[in-house]
Amino acid sequence: DLCNYGYWRLFDKSWTQLDFYNYGKFLNDNLRKYPEKSIISLSDKKNEKIKLGFLSSDLKGDHSVSYFLKTVLRNYNQNQFEIIIFNNHKEDKISQELTNLINKIIHIGKLSDLEAFNNIRKYNLDVMIDIMGYTSRNRIELFKNKIAKKQIIWMGYCNTTGLTNMDYIITDPNLVLKNEKKHYVEKVLYLPDIWNCHCGFDIKREENPSPLIKNKYVTFGSFNNPAKINENVINCWSNILKRVKNSKLIIKCADKRRKLDRIQEVFKKNGLQDSVIFHHRIDNLEDHLNLYKKIDIALDTFPYNGVTTSFE
């Protein structure tokens, strides 16, 4: 999928901001433009409250996006805003939970792009916030054709979309450097400290002693997406393991055999195959979080660092 290509390039150190800018402009020029006769016109009717929409495919199960979105939905001014979520996924416990925080959830997962576009236009949104960007199952084509009076990109894809109809990007000074703003199509809206806030987990919290005390060796760990673990990262981590005597590294990642084989091969080349322990996907959230108790020091990836993993 050409739209997913930009997301995966976020993990590629060779791409510059100019590359992302040109990629976005290419998509803007090549995404489908809907014929005027087939679409509902944008209304100029003024709403009583600011009507704000969120569009996502990731409000499901224990996907990280919901943990970030809840901080907004629990704290918005209900006297000034009416919030509607357009969910590009089937209804589940997460969407049911979010329903209690906002005005309405509309499920558009079974609609074609054009059907979803006209359905959303009926709600006369003042602002639509895309929290997917170029991630999987995105609906970026809707934003190309302008589904709301103002359109914003936030959260899911931390870069320019290249779409001339995308008005703003919500970010912070660490994500969008001041000297790179010229390579963003959107107007950059800086939050003062950080672009996002995790709501935390509703689980029992327990202090646990460092595993070093029992093991007598240091345990490093990373639970990041394996796509972020490139050869430069592996070589960096290998140097750390070699310099810290008898240390171990726990890597937890989904069962993506090809990526896992690639990671194991580089560690083996570096003579560290016995120092790295792999844990496969853990579906239960509490079991996943408990695995952190086996780690003394978390190691981060680069150029695309941990987000949800770092918050955890």
Where in the sequence are the language-model features?
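A short, basic/aromatic alpha-helical/loop segment that forms part
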Residues: A227-E231
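Hydrophobic, well-ordered secondary-structure elements that form the walls
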Residues: W237, L299
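Alpha-helical solenoid repeat scaffolds of the TPR/TPR-like class and their adjacent stem/linker regions
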Residues: D1-Y217, N225, N235, E265, ...
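Short Ser/Thr-rich beta->loop micro-motif in glycosyltransferases that lines
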Residues: M132, D300-Y304
